[in-house]
Amino acid sequence: MKTRILILLLLSFLPASLLPAQAQGDDEAFFRQAAAGSCILYRGHQAYAYHIHYNGTYCWSDAEFKTGDVRYNGKLYHDIPLNVDAARQELLVRNAVGQGGKVLSREFVEWFTLGGQRFVNLQALSGPKAPAGYWEVLFDGKTQFLRQVSKKLMKDYNGEKRQMIGEGVPYDSRIHETFVRDVAYCVITEAGELIPVRSKSQIRNLFPAQRKEIRRHIVALEDRFNRSMTLEEYGVEVLKFVEAR
């Protein structure tokens, strides 16, 4: 393969008129074949266009497409520009800068990476009874801790939704439509049981024999940093502590 690519690079410096017709045809076929590997990713329908003024973003974090990997329909694709429409729970793919995204069929998406983080489709991995949408893997050990960010477009007057769009997101009080951010958490135990998580005690109670040690460890950390942990921080820290023992 390396020799083939080197030959193609050398030939590319020659005028087309000096290349045999057969060589030109072979080169075109070679590049078509190389590009065809990811063509299936771009066959979906166009991403939904939100033709309104709104605060916040419908995306998982921001509107930037980031390069990642995706396992789609049983095949792994590398270095693909991806983003997530969190309002519709759709994985978007783009094949060129300036072009709108295409939607990947969720039933064929097993997992993907975005911004260095791993995301999974629980229904593709565990069946239709699992929670729908995409979930970010916050801790990947014997017990997994996952997070789902969802967005909902809501009416917004007098700045009442300002604190519900996420940190560092621009806000204009003259706009009366806002994408409100919501976050859900769950754990998947070593036995494969999926448990929704709404409180710190739910995580701690997963390990009844170690609750006292967990409490002491967390108190020591919170004293050191002089603040209480968020639910997300707490879940990751508890699982790290338990699995390190």
Residue ranges and their predicted role:
Residues I195-R245:
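Long, compositionally biased interface segments
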Residues P20-P81:
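General N-terminal leader/first-domain-start detector
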Residues P15-Q22, Y42, N55, F145, ...:
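Generic low-polarity alpha-helical segments
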Residues I7-S17:
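Bacterial N-terminal signal peptides
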Residues M1-I5:
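Positively charged n-region of N-terminal signal peptides that target proteins for export
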Residues S61, K66-R198:
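Aromatic-patch recognition
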Residues L18, D26-F30, E107-F108, Q202, ...:
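Exposed alpha-helical structural elements
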